[in-house]
Amino acid sequence: MSEMTPREIVSELDKHIIGQDNAKRSVAIALRNRWRRMQLNEELRHEVTPKNILMIGPTGVGKTEIARRLAKLANAPLIKVEATKFTEVGYVGKEVDSIIRDLTDAAVKMVRVQAIEKNRYRAEELAEERILDVLIPPAKNNWGQTEQQQEPSAARQAFRKKLREGQLDDKEIEIDLAAAPMGVEIMAPPGMEEMTSQLQSMFQNLGGQKQKARKLKIKDAMKLLIEEEAAKLVNPEELKQDAIDAVEQHGIVFIDEIDKICKRGESSGPDVSREGVQRDLLPLVEGCTVSTKHGMVKTDHILFIASGAFQIAKPSDLIPELQGRLPIRVELQALTTSDFERILTEPNASITVQYKALMATEGVNIEFTDSGIKRIAEAAWQVNESTENIGARRLHTVLERLMEEISYDASDLSGQNITIDADYVSKHLDALVADEDLSRFIL
């Protein structure tokens, strides 16, 4: 689990997301509170429940990006789901309990990677011994059994030294490795994913673990042997329990597009993919026990972060019980021209940096001037205002149109320097931006 302070979390998010300070602060505090809770005594820790967050803001302002970046920072089980993919229990489609099952699967993978990393040093030693056994087979007695030598032979030590120095990396050897499990693809109807995964694991376990002789270079064999030996050192039952504990104590669920499951107007039929989903979400958010293939998981202390544009619906259109379970409201602001300018230049891997790197592979040096950046930002903002406001995503559309000619001719422009200034942008975009009909379909 991450031990970063709220200030450090916000600072890390600032490297990728421009503006939206309130949302960053709320998420940072919620993440830090997970750590604070774990420092309490067990009795009080059980009483402290997470304060779930509802992020409200137009499309393209950074709601989903905050979730993506948070997943990398949290060092805790985190899953992002779309609210529109679920239906009420009993109808065709995924039920909301599958959120917790997927979160537990993600936790098992995360804990397994950590356990393998922890045992890597020992796994490297065992892998090294197996390769040395192939290069210099151990001595055998009259009954064909391997004799245990007190001290490794001089030849074995010499080969060990060469192996560690990489002198034998390209030498080919034949070695026995665990055969890949039998793959069985099962097509199941929506909502039956749990049964499908259980059937697949059952088929994979048929016939036990088989060994298969493979001819590989030593450097490739070493990688596979390290993975195999590390997996043997991991206790599966302990791993499952650690994963369930991680989900229950540190799990985070990010539910996107929650505004799309709000009830709109009066309808006579059953609303299985809107209000029905909200009702099914209630016990998860409030706290219940969900059955997964790894064991029973309690959701009492899982943090839920929901987000939605709420352009048609309003937060008050959510059923009152769900509103009460999302006590922290954060409003994200629409982006301005200056925000667009910062998005084009400040993030670590901004769009302009990406385009420059892509063109550099063809030997073309692209330079964006300040005036060019400003004009691109103005064009994107202008199109957003005159057509549909899709936030920062408009920058991708505008830049792709601007760079189309250079991208097409890049292989013929090798060694050239191209400067993209205000005049260049105006020449290529002004006609499109000014014509509302054209910009509606092209930008």
From Swiss-Prot:
Induction trigger: By heat shock.
Keyword set includes Chaperone: yes
GO BP annotation list: protein unfolding; proteolysis involved in protein catabolic process
Binding site for ATP: I18, G60, V61, G62, K63, T64, E65, D256, E321, R393
Keyword set, alphabetical order: ATP-binding, Chaperone, Cytoplasm, Nucleotide-binding, Stress response
InterPro entries assigned to the protein according to its UniProt record, in alphabetical order: AAA+_ATPase, ATP-dep_Clp_protease_ClpX, ATPase_AAA_core, Clp_ATPase_C, HslU, P-loop_NTPase
Main location: cytoplasm
GO molecular function, one term: ATP hydrolysis activity
Top-level taxon of origin: Bacteria
An example Gene Ontology CC term for this record: HslUV protease complex
Compartment annotation: Cytoplasm
Complexes and interactors: A double ring-shaped homohexamer of HslV is capped on each side by a ring-shaped HslU homohexamer. The assembly of the HslU/HslV complex is dependent on binding of ATP.
PANTHER family per record: ATP-DEPENDENT CLP PROTEASE ATP-BINDING SUBUNIT CLPX-LIKE, MITOCHONDRIAL-RELATED (PTHR48102), ATP-DEPENDENT PROTEASE ATPASE SUBUNIT HSLU (PTHR48102:SF3)
General function of this protein: ATPase subunit of a proteasome-like degradation complex; this subunit has chaperone activity. The binding of ATP and its subsequent hydrolysis by HslU are essential for unfolding of protein substrates subsequently hydrolyzed by HslV. HslU recognizes the N-terminal part of its protein substrates and unfolds these before they are guided to HslV for hydrolysis.
Family according to the record: Belongs to the ClpX chaperone family. HslU subfamily.
The name this protein goes by in its record: ATP-dependent protease ATPase subunit HslU
Organism: Shigella dysenteriae serotype 1 (strain Sd197)
Taxonomic placement: Bacteria, Pseudomonadati, Pseudomonadota, Gammaproteobacteria, Enterobacterales
